[in-house]
Amino acid sequence: MSTTERSKRQKQRKVLLMGRSGAGKSSMRSIIFSNYVAKDVRRLGATVDVEHSNIRFMGNLMLNLWDCGGQDSFVESYLSNQRSHVFSSVAVLIFVFDISSKVAASDMVSFADTIRALHEFSPNSKIFVLIHKMDLVPGEQKARALQQKAHDVRTTCEDEGFLGQQVEFWATSIWDQSLYKAWTQVIYFLVPNATVIENMLEKLAELLDARELILYERTTCLVVTHVTRGSEGRNPYTDRFERISSILKTHKHSMAKHTGTMASEVSFAEMQIKTGEFMFFITRLTENTNLAVVMPGDEAAFNAARVNVQLARQEFAHLDIMEKKGKEVQRQADTRGSAPGEDDVDTISSQARLS
């Protein structure tokens, strides 16, 4: 297959990353996509004009990320002579506010100008507003500061024609798991077959009798989706998925340091954690995903689950999004009158019982 043919099969989604200069856009991009750690982003310089990144995510889903410099001269250019070029065919706008900004009113004017241009050329796009650097706000003031900023932003969005469900707000900081949480929501919105994936994971979780399954993208360690069963739904650690993302990133950095390779190139076959109350393993599911499995504290069930996940790999191969394959799966599901992926996982179940 030629490069041109391959590119046509890739599903490209244009994502704008915008905000005033110094808001933290490039820092978060470097942490999520370039495997930086928080303490290292201080040496990053300001973004000049637009930095384009084509990021392959889960196979043929290509994120066309535009990191737009926030200096006034660049913003003026985006809104005037580059207006149609920048704001056309946008799937997602991620706008970053610095909660500690001394020019909050000016920031809001810039935001209003931005979404006005977005509504002109991409009125159906989704807006994720990241209220960033929340670590700089005293603990007792965080909720109030977030509520006030969200109210101001939502009012502006409604004035410019964006309905409530088109806009999401997330408080973020590079120093905790909140950054992974916010970007996970962005990725979940962009993945076109998330419901298909969840249906298949639910069947697999039932087969394994797993407490929880979490699907991670291998390069970024972002959560794609998860399935939680039974009492695990009452787990008080609501940020546990993002904590695992952070642990995986740290583990990759440690491996890179000891092997002399780049963190983005590091991979591992499997990681296991065993306690008296539960057992956990994370392993490759497809070329571009890892699956974390939380099991009861039973060695036999744990080992059976590891085998069954290996058997499941072939059935989950179409998660590495190929449009033609995805459409065929959906067409077959419509013909059968069942949810996409159900018959696939039933096959896994039969194999597991035979084993």
Model-derived features with residue positions:
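Conserved beta-strand/loop subsegment of P-loop NTPase cores
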Residues: 91-96, 122-135, 159-172
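Short, flexible boundary segments at extreme N-termini or domain junctions of P-loop NTPases and their
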Residues: 1-20, 53, 153-160, 168, ...
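A charged amphipathic helix-loop-strand protein-protein interaction module that recurs
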Residues: 197-198, 228-282
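Glycine-rich phosphate-binding P-loop
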Residues: 14-34
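Short hydrophobic alpha-helical segments used for membrane anchoring or interfacial signaling
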Residues: 213-219
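Switch I (effector-binding) loop of TRAFAC-class P-loop GTPase G-domains
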Residues: 33-61
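Canonical P-loop GTPase G-domain recognition
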Residues: 136-204, 210-212, 232-234, 355
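Switch II of P-loop NTPase G domains
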Residues: 49-50, 60-117
